[in-house]
Amino acid sequence: SLGMTELVSYWKITCSPKVKVLAGTLGDEQKAWWKDLYFNGLGEFFYVNGIREAEIENFMTIEAEAPEGEAGLKGEKPNAAEAEISRHPGVLVPVGGGKDSAVTLELLKKAGAEIWAYIINPRGATLETVKAAGLSNDRVIQVSRTLDQNMLELNRQGYLNGHTPFSAIVAFSSLIAARLY
């Protein structure tokens, strides 16, 4: 799911009418769900780039059929290792440094919850929010997210660029962190 969420950051460079997923299969409902997430998460991108005729019906086609013998065949990975269930009980709070995460941390503290903060690419505001909440460093999960340099170079050359559904990236990556931590 995280890869599917990150996909749109790269798709927006060319707005290809077809997306071909080779890492597994997706059913029709799943394809429709991803298409809906991408389309509705790209409103600012469409506006900034003057894309006025965008309609979900002709937005993109997603193909996701795993070839015979490939990983993810029919969504099954019989030899895949199972991730351990989280060893730390409590609540994982994504922290972006704004009022939403600050209020959430404060309310959970008052409720006596075991709190873990989750930060993507820590910076001043996120670190200050965690500090203000009184969380120790061992209660903070920090991850680094980088974008491909080729994509950034294409953006510099004038290829399409703009906002993508970052909240979805936070949601899916925090689920992975919660499961593994």
Question: What annotation goes with each model-predicted range?
Answer:
Residues 1-90, 102, 107-147, 159, ...:
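RNA-binding accessory domains that recognize and position tRNA/RNA substrates
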